[in-house]
Amino acid sequence: MTLTSRLRRTVSLAAITAVAGTAALAGTASAATFEKAPVLQPGATIPVDFPGYKEPANNKLKANYRIVVVQAEVARGERPSTIITAPKGFKLVTLGLREGAEVGFRADNDYVGKRSVRLTLGVNPNKVAQGQTGHATIYALARRAS
């Protein structure tokens, strides 16, 4: 009897652990959404002041440049990640946000001169209340690869 009760106890413990592990892996659904907008072409007005890029006097995008636009919506306390990719034949130059954005990001790798970058996003807790979502538009300036 001792062996069977031990065996039953071990099997039931393993089953409970498996169920709890599956529930932990499932987690809650992410509230983060990312929506890619159309790529801005030459002649379009440059929407933000990109760091390290001298905008022309007329504030229009020059030839051989494109701007990738991504709309992000992130819940406070979340740390989602996304990959931004330049159009084929283009390489990333710099990234930008509008002044006063509710969502910020950090690049997980060195992206200058590469076609894509993985970004980890976070919400500014001073601008977004607990339980709310923050909104931002992320801009990626890309230049034609030579």
Give a label for each model feature.
Residues 1-32:
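Secretory targeting and sorting signals
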